[in-house]
């Protein structure tokens, strides 16, 4: 019985120590840090963002030259792209917004024209296109509407010229294209993952 109680106490102490150690490590790597890229030694090494040769956790921002206007804001966790990224036109008008999770593109990738009108809405899941992706020309006319599943074209695919006339309109069924392709080089879509 003493052996059992001793073992239970040892396990309890070990669990508490491990939990505290894990919490301390997590706190140390997720402290909010925001730095100007021009003020630090920032490098990308094999896809890992480093500041002063260590994997970076925090926010990196860039300014337009000779201004205080933000050009870009990126977030990293342990050197990997993580969280929201934003790019701006001069004058702080939003140009792009996207999300990463542990180095992979996730969620919506949104792009705007300098006028503030929507230019693109692409959706990602685990680093590849997922769902409906759309593009508009600067005057607001829809010029592309594509559907994806796990990075592959699927279902209805449509594209228009800038004047609104149809460019291509086809369906993907069983990995093959049917309809108006609007291309000269037909490629088997079952071999094409879009990222």
Enumerate the predicted regions with their spans.
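Bacterial Sec-dependent N-terminal signal peptides
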Residues: 1-29
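Glycine/tyrosine- and acidic-biased, solvent-exposed loop/turn segments at the edges of beta-strands
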Residues: 19-195
């Amino acid at each position: 019985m003493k052996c059992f109680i001793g073992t239970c106490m040892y396990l309890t102490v070990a669990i508490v120590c491990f939990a505290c150690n894990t919490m301390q490590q997590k706190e140390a790597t997720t402290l909010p840090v925001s730095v100007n890229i021009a003020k630090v030694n920032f490098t990308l090494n094999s896809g890992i963002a480093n500041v002063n040769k260590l994997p970076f956790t925090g926010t990196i921002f860039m300014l337009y030259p000779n201004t205080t206007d933000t050009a870009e804001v990126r977030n990293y966790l342990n050197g990997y792209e993580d969280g929201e990224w934003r790019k701006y036109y001069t004058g702080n008008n939003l140009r792009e917004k996207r999300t990463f999770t542990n180095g992979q593109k996730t969620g919506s990738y949104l792009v705007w024209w300098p006028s503030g009108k929507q230019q693109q809405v692409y959706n990602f899941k685990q680093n590849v296109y997922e769902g409906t992706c759309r593009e508009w020309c600067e005057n607001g006319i829809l010029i592309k509407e594509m559907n994806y599943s796990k990075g592959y074209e699927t279902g209805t695919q449509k594209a228009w010229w800038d004047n609104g006339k149809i460019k291509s309109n086809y369906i993907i069924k069983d990995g093959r294209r049917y309809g108006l392709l609007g291309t000269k080089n037909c490629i088997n879509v079952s071999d094409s993952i879009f990222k």
